[in-house]
């Protein structure tokens, strides 16, 4: 459950280490890139898109500190309840930085990601992830 002012770790190799959520979009990726989402949602869950500020970044990499980016939430500490009764939760809140078309800006994804990303058409992130839970 991510809301404004939530801090997220970054699960890709764009150079950012930490993000600060400034807006929850909650939209999904369609065939023509990102669709407009409601800008009035309070919480973001796995698979939702947030607008965030890079709070910590490695030098000489793809993103810089204080840059405003879009990211998709891939892990949350809040438990995810599935239709079959399974409950899954992660140790951290993490996101992957994406471009305007919904494709990841990095070339690698670190750590496990939730299967719910497949339902929201983030198949590129699923294919880059080492483990899908």
UniProtKB/Swiss-Prot annotation:
GO terms for molecular function: large ribosomal subunit rRNA binding; structural constituent of ribosome. Keywords: Ribonucleoprotein, Ribosomal protein, RNA-binding, rRNA-binding. One of its GO terms (cellular component) is cytosolic large ribosomal subunit. GO terms for biological process: translation. It comes from the Bacteria. Binds to 23S rRNA. Forms part of two intersubunit bridges in the 70S ribosome. Part of the 50S ribosomal subunit. Forms a cluster with proteins L3 and L19. In the 70S ribosome, L14 and L19 interact and together make contacts with the 16S rRNA in bridges B5 and B8. Belongs to the universal ribosomal protein uL14 family. This is Large ribosomal subunit protein uL14. It comes from Gloeobacter violaceus (strain ATCC 29082 / PCC 7421). The gene is rplN.
